[in-house]
């Protein structure tokens, strides 16, 4: 038997093993009464970087009417996102309008319909602060905020006025007030406008500590988003770990990170709690890419992180419950109309392949899906896979 044949058979065997395991760990949720956390009062979903490279923009364009449709990109994950009370992603492109040119890397400007597609997929809140937020200058910041709001999305991290910047975004969900704060390490060398530096939240420890103190007064939970770290590195730096501990101790309840474009671990930092107790707060250093055209190792995948909160029976105090995730993969493929991109929830996609329910998934795609599942489970070994309620 030749080497190539042996490799093919080994790959098919790996897919078969993974497919056999998929239903057992994904498709049934255990009785909440048996959970150590109890029934959640709040379930949040967090996705990673939303990027539109040039091939994605071109693929979304309808040549008959020159309109751009990104909704099919997210159709497969829409049911998952709808199981959350609130869903978030990092909008790592600007929406500055067609007159400035729709472009991918290195200076991103996506069609405004991207925001509508994200809203339709189930997202409620987006971060607009990242190293690409000035890719069309100051006016691009304002236009992005305008188009995001028109789509019905809430945003944070970039602002029009000083007053906006000093008023944290607070969203009430199920009677619980959530504050969102966001910061970026860089704007890729593009300077902030003189006298209006407030339009972009830069990653500054003193600024963040002051904002955390303000947000704690306005909300029950504070979610801190940080665009940080080293691109394509699968583990956080010591500096990130130190910052995470500092900010969690200062009042953040949860840290969500992005920028590396690969999944990094989720850690739990021990923090002093009331009544001389100790609790663990999560930091997701990087959720990877939610959608992009990157194809370097590990950049074609990401996770949707689900974080649940429960109410303590005696005190009514909010407490973190289960933290789980669904690995995702960007499927780049051709159908009868040409090139397409779509985000697939990996376990569901593997099950669909096993049952022959997805005509666009071939053996090569199934092999990569199986690899993503194995890679992610190994990298996030302390976390369970999310089970739909």
PLM feature spans:
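Acidic, metal/ion-coordinating pockets
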Residues: 6-389
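Short, Lys/Arg-rich N-terminal segment immediately upstream of the first membrane anchor
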Residues: 1-5
């Amino acid at each position: 038997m030749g080497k190539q044949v042996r490799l093919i058979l080994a790959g098919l065997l790996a897919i078969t093993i993974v497919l056999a395991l998929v239903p057992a760990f994904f498709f049934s949720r255990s009785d909440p009464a048996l959970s150590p956390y109890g029934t959640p009062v709040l379930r949040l979903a967090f996705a990673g970087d939303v990027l539109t490279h040039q091939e994605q923009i071109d693929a979304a364009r309808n040549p008959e009417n020159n309109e751009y449709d990104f909704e099919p990109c997210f159709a497969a994950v829409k049911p998952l996102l709808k199981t959350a009370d609130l869903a978030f992603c990092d909008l790592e492109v600007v929406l500055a309008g067609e007159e400035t040119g729709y472009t991918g890397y290195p200076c991103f400007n996506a069609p405004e319909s991207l925001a509508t597609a994200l809203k339709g997929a189930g997202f409620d809140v987006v971060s607009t602060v990242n190293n690409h937020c000035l890719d069309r200058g100051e006016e691009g910041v304002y236009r992005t905020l305008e188009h995001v709001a028109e789509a019905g999305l809430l945003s944070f991290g970039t602002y029009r006025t000083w007053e906006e910047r000093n008023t944290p975004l607070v969203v009430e969900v199920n009677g619980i007030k959530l504050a969102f704060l966001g910061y970026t390490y860089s704007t890729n060398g593009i300077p902030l406008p003189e006298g209006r530096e407030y339009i972009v939240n830069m990653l500054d420890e003193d600024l963040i500590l002051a904002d955390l103190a303000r947000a704690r007064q306005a909300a029950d939970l504070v979610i801190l988003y940080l665009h940080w770290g080293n691109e394509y590195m699968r583990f956080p730096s010591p500096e990130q770990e130190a910052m995470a501990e500092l900010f969690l101790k200062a009042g953040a309840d949860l840290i969500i990170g992005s920028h590396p474009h690969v999944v990094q671990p989720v850690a739990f930092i021990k923090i002093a709690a009331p009544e001389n107790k100790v609790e663990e707060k999560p930091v997701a250093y990087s959720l990877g890419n939610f959608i992009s055209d990157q194809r370097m190792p590990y950049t074609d995948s990401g996770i949707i992180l689900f974080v649940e909160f429960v109410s303590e029976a005696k005190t009514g105090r909010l407490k973190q419950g289960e933290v789980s995730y669904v690995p995702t993969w960007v499927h780049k493929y051709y159908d009868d109309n040409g090139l397409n991109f779509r985000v697939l929830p990996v376990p569901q996609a593997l099950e669909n392949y096993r049952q022959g329910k997805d005509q666009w998934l071939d053996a090569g795609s199934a092999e990569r899906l199986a690899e993503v599942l194995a890679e992610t489970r190994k990298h996030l070994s302390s976390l369970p896979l999310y089970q739909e309620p």
